[in-house]
Amino acid sequence: MLERLQEICEEARAALNGACSLEELNEIRIRYLGKKGELTRVLRSMGSLSAEERPRIGQAANEIRDFIEKELAARTAALKEMVKEQKLRGDKIDVTLPGMPLPGGGKHPLTLVLEEIQRIFLGLGYSIVEGPEVETDYYNFEALNLPKDHPARDMQDTFFIGGEILLRTHTSPVQVRTMEKTAPGLPVKIIVPGKVYRRDDDATHSPMFHQVEGLAVDRRITFSDLKGTLDLFAREMFGPQTRTRFRPSYFPFTEPSAEVDISCVMCGGRGCRVCSQTGWLEILGSGMVHPRVLEVSGYNSEEVTGFAFGMGVERIAMLKYGIDDMRLLFENDLRFLQQFRS
């Protein structure tokens, strides 16, 4: 039996040295140390040995089992290290290769439209001016010919913060602030982009939206200057085929006042569902600066005239891009926003 144990030891050594994979090592472990393995069979036959032989054979069998287990562990560790090195060589990264580009973003449609508006008026010699979003009652209403008892205050739902402090309902207060700083200097040609706040929230209104106010003040400015300016703006923004229409309207801070319509961007003025079959779409309000506003701001209304206009950036964007729900502009849905990537 000692001879058989020695044979098992040599066979196991040769098998372990020739093993090239972890699967082969597992087969060797089962073949020699498993429940039906070669060494197990020898140990089970020890019952037939005499009392004198049993300790000697048992000791030899245990030594061989320990040897096989140690060799298995060593060979397993060596093969695992070899597999790891092979994987590392296969996964080698060339750090000199260019990296994968990150997905690029794009400008929001409101940003695109606002930049286009600014480009047009900067080309006409206007300057960009900004003002506070938290405004006083005086600049938001009273200085714009809207005294406290004026019924036109009901035209706007205002967010009051407390006392005379409120969130501005339009960018028009910056007109007065700029004229106060400039008077009696001439000319004044500014546009005022910014956020405004009103208590509205539906498919065509938002409690926070963007406006661009325009103001031109000088000697001998007429309504024809206003009309020519807005005609040019409409053609630049919506295309050279765009026609404009001025309708009489009312704004407390301009006199005379007019709403400005453009020929429908969907049907070209023929009449469709978007323009309610009229062929026209409203884009902004405008008018000649009211003499009282000029006087309050430090100008002599007998010598100086001016015009003003105000447009909602969301309104322009919806018409330019065919957007039918203003809320899409504020929901940050990437499926919507990705359509505007250049």
Curated annotation (Swiss-Prot):
Binds 2 magnesium ions per tetramer. It comes from Pelotomaculum thermopropionicum (strain DSM 13744 / JCM 10971 / SI). GO terms for biological process: phenylalanyl-tRNA aminoacylation. Belongs to the class-II aminoacyl-tRNA synthetase family. Phe-tRNA synthetase alpha subunit type 1 subfamily. PANTHER family: PHENYLALANINE--TRNA LIGASE, MITOCHONDRIAL, PHENYLALANYL-TRNA SYNTHETASE. GO terms for molecular function: ATP binding; catalytic activity, acting on a protein; magnesium ion binding; phenylalanine-tRNA ligase activity; transferase activity; tRNA binding. One of its GO terms (cellular component) is cytoplasm. This is Phenylalanine--tRNA ligase alpha subunit. Its cofactor is Mg(2+).
